[in-house]
Amino acid sequence: MYGGRNFKTRQFNYATNSIRQAGSTMKPFVLAQFLNDGYSINSPYPGPAELIVNGEDFKNYGDTNYGQMTVGDATRLSVNTIYVQLMQLVKPDRVAKFAKAHGLAAELAGDATADKDPRPLESAPVLKPVLALSLGSGDVTTLQLASAFGTWANRGIHQTPHLVEKVLDAKGRVLEEHPGNPQGRQVIAQQHADTMNLVLRSAVENGTGNAARLYGREVAGKTGTTSDYTDARFVGYTSDLVTSVWLGFDNPKKKLVGVRGLAGVSGGSLPAQIWHDYMDLATRDRPNKPFVPPAELGGVVLNPTTTAPPTTVPQPTQPGPQNPPPTQPAPTQPGPSLPPTTLTLPGPGPDPTNPA
């Protein structure tokens, strides 16, 4: 874990305490609920450049109209307007609760029974159940995202992260030891987690996260970029190791503009490159274990190279605020190799039961 430059000058851990918006790293939790409700990644949806719902205006990055495409391809290309439609279908409050079961947030807005964060409520991560949550309006920490994405790598079993395994004295005697939970908790059915891994692999292999590809090793992940380039994320994983990267300034209004010569830092640029450089070393001596193919597709495999061609941009039918976080691919530029937030995943637990 890399939580800051110098603990002596500032006792603040950016990995565990910096609460910022998720950007499009929130989209996979909508997809997880979509799969949990019995829908297919091969379901077709229109991807207009602009979508207005109850006066709220949602747009794709670059005003791109993707035409009709599958949910799998919409995830790979991070299509905002399709994900707003998915959120309408599966409902924001259910997505917020499902994301919390995966390890996101300490509070659900309006939920008086939510677990309390030890920090003051005004500084606790909050997932507000609104349509914009599908595009990343929820508050998260970098460690929470690593923990939550690790649930899919672990085939649906969530493990609560901990930093200290055990404490030994000078003679090697155990003074304290984390009790752990080797079996974890099944929060999404195993077959749905396998499908999540397939879709998020396509996002790396042929989508917005392609800068994170590792030679000869399967990688799944998702990019995230918030409005006006104030936050950029990449969360990715192999079958047994997950790493979460966040870039941003202390001032949440300061933009990641002009960094390393980029007009704007997106999740697919520096965060994905940092992830790649770190994970290339971190996985070098680890077994190369592929993901388990999803059985639930019945032989239908997601085609990561097929998309519907863009069509003409539809005209909006009514005015509304323009505030969706942008999601975009980005050009590759060399980036620094900083140690991000990494979790080592335990082996899968017992056979899955119905997801919680």
Predicted regions and their residues:
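Proline/serine/threonine-rich low-complexity "mucin-like" segments in extracytoplasmic/periplasmic regions
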Residues: 295-356
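Glycine-rich, acidic and aromatic/proline-enriched surface loops and short helix-turn segments
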Residues: 1-5, 35-39, 47-50, 76-80, ...
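Mid-domain, small-residue-enriched loop/turn segments at the edges of structured enzyme/sensor domains
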Residues: 56-63, 91-147, 163
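A penicillin-recognizing enzyme superfamily signal
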Residues: 1-21, 26, 73, 139-306, ...
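Short active-site loop at a secondary-structure junction
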Residues: 9-29, 41-47, 69, 132-133
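Surface-exposed patches in mature extracellular/periplasmic domains of secreted proteins
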Residues: 42-44, 107-127, 132-133, 159-165, ...
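Conserved catalytic neighborhood of penicillin-recognizing serine enzymes
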Residues: 39-95, 130-133, 158, 170-202
